[in-house]
Amino acid sequence: MTTSAPTEKLPLYRSLYFQVVCAVIAGVALGYFYPSVGESMKPLGDGFIKLIKMMIAPIIFCTVVVGIAGMEDMKKVGKTGGLALLYFEVVSTFALIIGLLLVNLFQPGAGMNIDAATLDTKSIAAYTGPGKMVSTTDFILNVIPTAFVDAFAKGEILQVLLLAILFGFALHRFGGRGTLVFDMIEKSSHVLFTIVGFIMKVAPIGAFGAMAFTIGKYGVGSLFSLGKLMGAFYLTCLIFIFGVLGAIARIHGFSVWKFIKYIKEELLIVLGTSSSESVLPRMMEKMENLGAKKTTVGLVIPTGYSFNLDGTSIYLTMAAVFIAQATNTPMTLMQEITLLGVLLLTSKGAAGVTGSGFIVLAATLSAVGTVPVAGLALILGIDRFMSEARALTNLIGNGVATLVVAKWTNELDMERLQAGLNNETWEEAQEPERVLDKKTEHMPVSAMSDAG
């Protein structure tokens, strides 16, 4: 394997990891000591997330088009997509089951003795109103954009992915005649990633604003009011990450702990912003740096943001059973299995919908009919603090899924993977945008003519 000469590490103060840690600590301090000022910092976090979101659609489009158009065997695209969906279904089912088992073991809602009739349901009306849950048919139809530009304007990931797949297939059919378009799209992707590199420079500001707002608005005290559920949920996420995902990673030849260290900067940004989308472009590039082929990365990561929400799956089963425990609503084994079965369907049907956690939970509780929907009011206040664990688990789960599916399809360079996880490719691991210019000089210009 050919490796580049080792590069000098950045000084600690210039490390994005260090900057985000300091920003999060400063945000917590500001929100705690000056709550009103902390609340006013919300635009900083919102602005950073919007900056990243504006780049997601074009990056996914360029990455997937280049990956598909440059492939010699089109059957691999279908195989990759099929294996990814199979993996998503199996692992997210494991997440639901683990959440169900551990919430029964920890019993976080036992002893609260809440009368559901006394709960104020006004606060959850926005999540439980008619038409909030998207049907399977509507979900499938929503994947098809009304216009080509509309998908990009609205930032609909699955719609952009569909357009990219179709465009990539069509460009592949052109063979050598499409080389000019292929080269233009590929070079555009490098420009887009360079822009993401610029945006990431302000990630500490975004993390600071989001954390200051959260602590300022909700207060540290609200962390303790329903701390037992939060503690059980965070512990369950850790068990899932190091137990289930750790075992999957080990079977496929890499360490989940080393992988977490590799994406530590992205995890900190997600911790600050509570949005796994805030690092989607950077995660795609980092997966490529680990040796996963562009096609696999472009298909698995965007799809995983809709179908592989492991942290959300754990949250759904734990929250539903917690409400039952808190309101003294007995649930038989059959009723819990029914709850699990309904969640297998509803957790996919609301993918990509704002507030999907509450919407899915409300729809599921209504469908099962055993647990009072009014109990959602119990967890509304701490949901914001559990969103970090959901987003972090989702991010790690999608990263592991990408590497696993890439290995299944022989699209993973294991030597490059081990080098990246062992910090042998330090520059690419920690500052991927710094090597974009070097990569631009080695773009596969002949890929299109070979495909033809």
UniProtKB/Swiss-Prot annotation:
Any one GO molecular-function label of the UniProt entry: malate:proton symporter activity
Would the keyword Signal be found if you checked this record's keyword annotation?
no
Q: Which keywords has UniProt assigned to this entry? A: Cell inner membrane, Cell membrane, Membrane, Symport, Transmembrane, Transmembrane helix, Transport
Write down the Gene3D superfamilies for this protein, in alphabetical order: Sodium:dicarboxylate symporter
Q: Where is this region: Disordered?
A: 426-452
Q: Where is the composition biased (Basic and acidic residues)?
A: 431-442
Q: Which PROSITE patterns match?
A: NA_DICARBOXYL_SYMP_1 (PS00713), NA_DICARBOXYL_SYMP_2 (PS00714)
Q: Which GO terms describe its cellular component?
A: plasma membrane
Localization, per the record, is:
Cell inner membrane
Q: Where does the UniProt annotation place the signal sequence?
A: none
The transmembrane residues are 18-38, 51-71, 83-103, 151-171, 191-211, 229-249, 304-324, 337-357, 359-379
Q: Which domain of life is it from?
A: Bacteria
Task: Kindly list the biological process annotations in GO that this record carries.
Answer: L-aspartate transmembrane transport
Q: Which InterPro entries match?
A: C4_dicarb_transport, Na-dicarboxylate_symporter, Na-dicarboxylate_symporter_CS, Na:dicarbo_symporter_sf
> How does the protein's chain sit in the membrane according to the entry?
Multi-pass membrane protein
Instruction: Name the Pfam families for this protein.
Output: SDF
Q: What is its main location?
A: membrane
Q: What's this protein's function? A: Responsible for the transport of dicarboxylates such as succinate, fumarate, and malate from the periplasm across the membrane.
Family matches, as NCBIfam families: PRK01663.1 (NF002461), PRK13027.1 (NF009587)
Q: Which family does it belong to?
A: Belongs to the dicarboxylate/amino acid:cation symporter (DAACS) (TC 2.A.23) family.
UniProt-recorded name of the protein? C4-dicarboxylate transport protein 1
Biological source species: Polaromonas naphthalenivorans (strain CJ2)
